[in-house]
Regions:
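Glycine-rich loop/turn
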Residues: 20-48
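Generic low-polarity alpha-helical segments
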Residues: 47-52, 162
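Conserved NAD+-utilizing ADP-ribose enzyme module
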Residues: 1-18, 23-25, 42, 63-178
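Short active-site loop/helix that positions an aromatic residue
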Residues: 54-65
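A generic structural signal for alpha-helix starts
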Residues: 51-54, 103
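Short helix/loop capping segments that flank catalytic or ligand/cofactor-binding pockets
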Residues: 37-38, 58-59, 155-156
Length: 178
């Protein structure tokens, strides 16, 4: 499905002078499925410097459902590119989940919050190993991945339980095997 999708400027309903800072900064990338340029120039940065709870909420709540379902998005830690060849990804791998379209928006938004809040894994070791999350559309479902910097953390039971994200059939793929 080729269409122009834009992210509206995040807004908040109230003015908040105090920012609740995240432990790390994040960057949200976008890549159209029809784009065959897999170099970094083929990606668009939708928002960088995602460094506060307020920015996370505003961005996540203003991301259109169609963008989540029909384009490729990559939420990565600041300084890590959305490519497995990145030195901080190369020795790692990813969990790969199949999520039907009916639940994609709900699952993606929950994972987005948990990743930014360093709570996607059930312990600090898992959370610090997580480099990002990605979504890729297919016909009636999407593939959502959790990218890790190493391949020591291959137990999907150590990932936070998310409704409609089943651990049955989840695969762990080492990036070097791609």
């Amino acid at each position: 499905m080729e269409q122009s999708m834009e992210l509206s400027e995040p807004t908040t309903s109230t003015t908040c002078t105090q920012q609740h800072m995240l432990n790390d900064k994040w960057v949200l990338y976008h890549h159209l499925p029809s784009n065959k340029d897999w170099t970094l120039s083929g990606y668009t940065v939708l928002m960088d410097n995602i460094d506060s709870v307020e920015k996370t909420i505003a961005l996540n709540e203003n991301t259109p459902e169609k963008m989540i379902k029909y384009s490729m998005m990559f939420l990565m830690r600041d300084g890590i590119t959305p490519m497995w060849e990145d030195p901080r990804n190369r020795s790692g791998g990813c969990f790969s989940y199949k999520v039907i379209n009916k639940f994609v928006e709900q699952v993606w938004k929950q994972m987005f919050y948990l990743a930014c809040g360093e709570s996607l894994g059930l312990n600090d070791s898992y959370n610090t190993s997580i480099n990002g999350i990605t979504i890729s559309p297919k016909k009636n479902f999407c593939i959502i991945k959790i990218w890790l910097r190493d391949n020591k953390h291959q137990d999907p039971n150590m990932i936070h339980n998310i409704e409609h994200l089943t651990k049955n059939g989840v695969m762990f793929k080492i990036h070097g095997d791609s």
